[in-house]
């Protein structure tokens, strides 16, 4: 019973860390990264579809993304979707592929991106803390229902706290790495 509660809390915390990694991957850091376009949805026969499901997205150079659609007819739609996105990127097409040159980030934009990254990291820290709170509530309920002794619950709560601290540290490391990547000129 207690082990299940601990395992469930840890799984939620793992999901929060993975979610943060995905979120931060989509933040532009001055380098071309195919993950930038993961959230760009293209209207493909009336259905919003991610770019990476319609084309091969590659990064042959540090500041260049190349999108090679499997269906050439969708090329203009992909261009429109990229222009509409909040990425601030301008695609150029030659009829077969779309090239996106990633411009250098200004110092002001870098600091804005760092703020966004910190905000996202805090959101995911809150998720980890919520998982801790839920686990502690379940542990207290199991103590109240006489399913576990007070000592067992205390030990389990300490484990939950250690796990929480561990995942918060992981989030902080991920954030520090992303901040360094963003501030890199």
Swiss-Prot record:
Responsible for the release of ribosomes from messenger RNA at the termination of protein biosynthesis. May increase the efficiency of translation by recycling ribosomes from one round of translation to another. Gene3D superfamilies: 3.30.1360.40, Ribosome-recycling factor. The gene is frr. This is Ribosome-recycling factor. InterPro entries: Ribosome_recyc_fac, Ribosome_recyc_fac_dom, RRF_sf. GO terms for biological process: translational termination. GO terms for cellular component: cytoplasm. Residues 135-159 are annotated as: Disordered. The keyword DNA-binding does not apply. It comes from the Bacteria. It comes from Moorella thermoacetica (strain ATCC 39073 / JCM 9320). It holds the Pfam family RRF. It is found in: Cytoplasm. Keywords: Cytoplasm, Protein biosynthesis. GO terms for molecular function: ribosomal large subunit binding.
